[in-house]
A protein has these predicted regions:
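Flexible, P/S/T/G-rich "lid" or insertion loops adjacent to the active sites of thioester-utilizing
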Residues: 83-92, 255-312, 500-505, 540
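Conserved AMP-binding/adenylation subdomain of ANL enzymes
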Residues: 674-703, 711-751
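Carrier-protein-dependent adenylate-forming modules in NRPS/ANL systems
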Residues: 1-232, 301, 329, 362-363, ...
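Non-catalytic, low-complexity flexible loops and terminal extensions
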Residues: 66, 218-288, 365, 376, ...
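AMP-dependent adenylate-forming
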Residues: 425, 508-509, 623-653, 683, ...
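His-Asp-centered acyl/peptidyl-transfer active-site segments
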Residues: 86-95, 112, 123-124, 179, ...
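Gly/Ser/Thr-rich phosphate-binding loop
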Residues: 722-725, 750-754, 764-833, 842
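Conserved AMP-binding
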Residues: 203, 531, 579-582, 603, ...
Length: 948
């Protein structure tokens, strides 16, 4: 190793070297000074002493002889060059700024001369860049990048149109670093005293402060003011920084800062996970748009006053408000922000007068806080920011490289840039009137910029076009500016942040949840008895070849009811139903409900142990069964399908619609099924609304392929009674046979399909090879699982005139609670959206603190309204856990465990599950129940289930 390498190695190991009284001294952490390095130091001791003793103080010096020799780019410049490559995420463009100023450049010749002298003075205006990561200053350029337009005789409208046209041409102009002059000046002379100057500048050649330098120089030269020649140039500064990195003091600081960041690296979060448009690809969007907000001088002074009171810098406070806004829309609440650092070291009097890129970056980790107030969060923010800036010898770019080495997220596209308090006595925007500005940066999605202006302080977001859904940024920026507005009040600082949804969002949510509709107060079987009196001979049910009129079904129900009464069944009792599909199954349900009792449908094919669990959990009095082996308890009733022997008519107990009607058991995560106890009123609210919305009537024939223990059957049965429609059931032996469905549809001209998507996909596949002209339904209801867009396309192709509706919700909320007509789908929808609430039902998407989520923020879907279940039968703990009153929204809600988000139009999108629940053909299956069942066997004591 040479001497510099030895010194570098010592610094890396935090070994300090110094000379005192002509002798070399060192201080080393324990174990850092290994034998090999000691030998190197010992062998080169005299040279090290000489270097440390006689090394000149590193000062920036002008090297006129090497002015045009190429020199290295900075880390920031290298990242800008890399970002121009469209192969990188969010790349494909340069970093540049476009600005328009109101100026007094009204003499064309003087302006051309001023620009010529400006280009001669500032070497970086003549810079070129190579593919190898080098830059060089050209001795001269052949043509000045100037355009001048005389608009003295134009109207104001014409002037504005001309300027806008030019703005659209050059504000996002992309320069070729290897060939182009990297800036443009366009001057519009309006009259003898006023002009508008448009500046387009690639920030490879100059940072934000460089615009100030450019305008100052231009104004001085134009005004014939004495302008002192520069004693150094940008190349001299880069040479200085290269030498600086070899200095022992810098090396000690560099490795100290590197250790600081490496100690944090494993704890650093990723970028904010804010929803992006599903149709966005990183190569499509090459432009930015801007949202801006100006604090006038009075407001800014009040803002500064509050910051001083709480000992917080304005920059730290603005950063916190920006992060709090991002947090509200981010899936992850801990994230990284890129901070732009204005870094012009005080090493020469001319350092503030040079055009060039002096910026650096650092990272800021925002973490969700348990703080009780904004002031505590602001203090924490300021401390982290100060600590990170103090360790900036190891730059943000270098930290990102370390993250990449560890296969962690290394593109942080959310940026914060503040020139408030940057050290400049004056800022460009404070001295001249800015009419318009916008910047663009590769691999950046939102750049929050804070800068002083002639009017106060400008806060703007430069946002990459096409990345976010329309309206999202408007809502975010509205909340951000409201936080700024509120920060001039002590109450804001002294309390926790109150989540603020934008006014438009609040308006849309209120409208979407305004679902109140007056329906009759009916129970589930009231309509059945009405039809029995009015239309006793009308066919209400067909199963296979067997038809059931209202009177026939009533007689069968009366036979079953007699047996129930003989066994002491009364109002409120729970009765299990284990019958196969058919008239006797439906009649059993009618018989049970007529007594005010509760029917509990049970799958007779499931393991006996699970049936026992259901019987015990529901406190079932007796079960109605058909096959001898299905008997569960001594009191159970076996049905003879050929015995319609009751001499008594079907009794109908009058009861309130708020009493329980049925209890459907779903999979439980503890291994024990949970029974959802539903009232007549809750189920009827959904049934009446679906029949009303989609005009289900006595002309309809409903295909009822769902099992009784699946809540879609509740609609099939009782919608038929309510609407006087006909219910068509498949034979039990062929209920899963698609060809049997086809036969039924062909024979009976079924008009309403009520299926889960998997069933519909099977049916559509069958129809592709069979004539479906006689099987054209009027209405298709799909629910129970994701509904793929391709399925809807197939349905539209096969049945172009059929109304198809996606439905969703939970067994705990009365069959369905939400709907979406599929004819309203967009081309970009990969699945049918969840939709909007049904009548008298309301939806909320809540975060972990039960606050409403902003648009496109994933949270838990919660349902409120008239269709909510009573709870889980005989399980008050689970009921209290899942059915809760939420003060923030003043509602009793059911926590579905489903994850979703609101679009900006109020439509809800289903995203997935919070837990391990999965859907199998529409049925809810808790993986925990499967695991608990497996663990009962010795070989499976340690097992886990996952969805594949």
């Amino acid at each position: 190793m040479n001497v510099n390498e030895i010194i570098n190695k010592c610094a890396e190991k935090n070994i300090q070297l110094w000379v005192k009284d002509g002798k070399l001294h060192f201080k080393s952490p324990q174990g850092a000074f290994g034998d090999e390095l000691k030998q190197e130091v010992k062998a080169n001791k005299e040279k090290i002493i000489e270097l440390l003793t006689h090394k000149e103080v590193n000062i920036v010096q002008n090297n006129i002889e090497e002015e045009y020799i190429e020199f290295p780019v900075t880390d920031i410049q290298a990242s800008y060059l890399l970002g121009r490559n469209p192969g990188y995420l969010y790349g494909g463009l340069g970093c540049k700024i476009y600005a328009e100023f109101l100026t007094e450049f009204t003499d064309e010749n003087k302006f051309r001369f001023a620009v010529k002298k400006l280009v001669e003075r500032q070497g970086m205006l003549r810079a070129r860049f190579s593919k190898e990561g080098k830059q060089a200053i050209l001795p001269e350029i052949s043509k000045l990048p100037i355009e001048i337009y005389h608009l003295e005789n134009e109207t104001e409208n014409d002037i504005n149109r001309e300027i806008l046209q030019k703005r659209n041409q050059i504000q996002f102009k992309q320069y070729n670093p290897e060939k182009d002059i990297m800036f443009d000046l366009v001057l519009f002379i309006i009259n003898r005293k006023k002009s508008v100057l448009c500046l387009s500048l690639d920030m490879l050649i100059g940072d934000y402060i460089s615009i100030d330098v450019l305008m100052n120089d231009l104004e001085q030269i134009y005004s014939n003011q004495q302008i002192v020649p520069l004693k150094i140039n940008y190349r001299d500064y880069i040479t200085y920084t290269q030498h600086q990195r070899e200095d022992i003091n810098f090396l000690n600081k560099f490795y100290e800062d590197k250790a600081y960041w490496k100690n944090k690296i494993d704890l650093l979060p990723g970028k904010p996970e804010i929803y992006t448009s599903v149709d966005f690809t990183d190569t499509e969007s090459k432009t930015f748009f801007q949202k801006k907000y100006t604090l006038n001088i009075s407001k800014w002074e009040k803002f500064e006053e509050k910051c001083r009171k709480y000992h917080i810098t304005p920059t730290a406070m603005m950063l916190l408000l920006y992060c709090l806004t991002l947090k509200q829309w981010s899936k992850n609440k801990d994230f990284l922000i890129n901070i732009t650092v204005m870094q012009r070291p005080n090493i020469h009097d001319d350092i503030q007068k040079i055009i060039g890129d002096f910026t650096s970056t650092t990272l800021f980790e925002f973490k969700e806080s348990d703080s009780n107030s904004i002031k505590e969060q602001a203090t924490q923010t300021q401390k982290i920011l100060f600590d990170n800036l103090t360790h900036n010898a190891f730059s943000g770019i270098e930290v990102l490289r370390e993250l990449k080495r560890k296969d962690k997220e290394s593109i942080i596209p959310y940026v914060f840039t503040s020139t408030v308090g940057s050290g400049n006595k004056e800022n460009i925007l404070q001295k001249r009137q800015l009419l318009y500005k916008i910047s663009e940066t590769p691999q950046v999605l939102i750049d929050c910029q804070v800068s002083k202006t002639i009017d106060g302080v400008l806060v703007n977001w430069d946002v990459r076009e096409g990345v976010f859904p329309r309206g999202l940024i408007d809502e975010m920026f509205e909340s951000f500016t409201e936080y700024i507005h509120n920060s001039v009040f002590d109450e804001f600082w002294e309390n926790k942040l109150m989540i603020n949804l934008g006014s438009n969002t609040r308006k849309i949510r209120k409208k979407i949840n305004d679902t109140e509709k007056l329906y009759e107060n009916k129970n589930l079987i009231e309509s059945f008895f009405l039809r029995c009196r009015k239309n006793p001979d009308r066919t209400v049910l067909i199963c296979g070849e067997e038809k059931f009129s209202y009177s026939k079904l009533e007689n069968i129900a009366a036979t079953i009811q007699t047996r129930l009464l003989e066994n002491g069944i009364k109002k409120g009792d729970k009765v299990g139903v284990l019958l196969e599909k058919g008239g006797w199954q439906i009649a059993s349900v009618i018989a049970i409900l007529s007594l005010g009792a509760v029917y509990v449908p049970i799958d007779a094919s499931q393991p006996k142990e699970r049936i026992y669990q259901i019987v015990n959990q529901a406190n079932i009095e007796l079960n109605i069964y058909q096959k001898k082996e299905e008997r569960i308890t001594e009191k159970d009733i076996r049905i003879d399908l050929h015995d319609i022997s009751s001499k008594n008519g079907l009794k109908y107990e009058c009861f309130d619609s708020d009493v329980s009607a049925y209890c459907i058991f779903t999979s439980g995560s503890t291994g024990i099924p949970k029974g959802v106890e539903m009232t007549h009123a809750a189920a009827m609210n959904t049934i009446m609304d679906i029949c009303s919305k989609f005009e289900v009537s006595d002309d309809d024939k409903i295909l009822g392929i769902s099992n009784l223990y699946f809540d879609l059957s509740v609609f099939d049965i009782f919608a038929a009674f309510y609407a006087n429609a006909t219910l068509i059931l498949p034979l039990e032996s062929r209920k899963k046979d698609v060809s049997h469905w086809y036969e039924l549809c062909t024979k009976y001209h079924i008009t309403v399909y009520n299926m889960v998507p998997a069933q519909m996909e099977m049916f559509m596949a069958y129809l592709q090879v069979n004539d479906c002209r006689k099987n054209v339904p009027r209405l298709i209801l799909l629910s129970g699982d994701w509904i793929p867009a391709n399925l809807i396309k197939n349905i539209r192709t096969r049945f172009p005139k059929t109304q198809c509706v996606g439905l969703g919700g939970a067994t705990e909320a009365g069959i369905w609670s939400i709907y979406f007509p599929t004819d309203k789908m967009s081309e970009t929808d990969r699945n049918v959206p969840y939709g909007i609430p049904l009548s008298n039902q309301r939806f909320y998407i809540l975060d972990e603190n039960d606050n409403p989520c902003a648009d496109y923020v994933i949270g838990e879907i919660c349902i409120a309204g008239k269709s909510l279940a009573k709870g889980y039968m005989n399980d008050p703990e689970l009921t209290n856990n899942k059915f809760q009153y939420i003060g923030q929204i003043n509602e009793r809600i059911y926590r579905t465990g489903d994850l979703g988000l609101y679009r900006e139009d109020g439509i809800i999108e289903f995203v997935g599950r919070k837990d391990t629940q999965v859907k199998v053909n529409g049925y809810r299956v808790e993986l925990g129940e499967i695991e608990n069942a497996l663990r009962k066997y010795k070989k499976n004591r340690k097992c886990s289930c996952s969805e594949k």
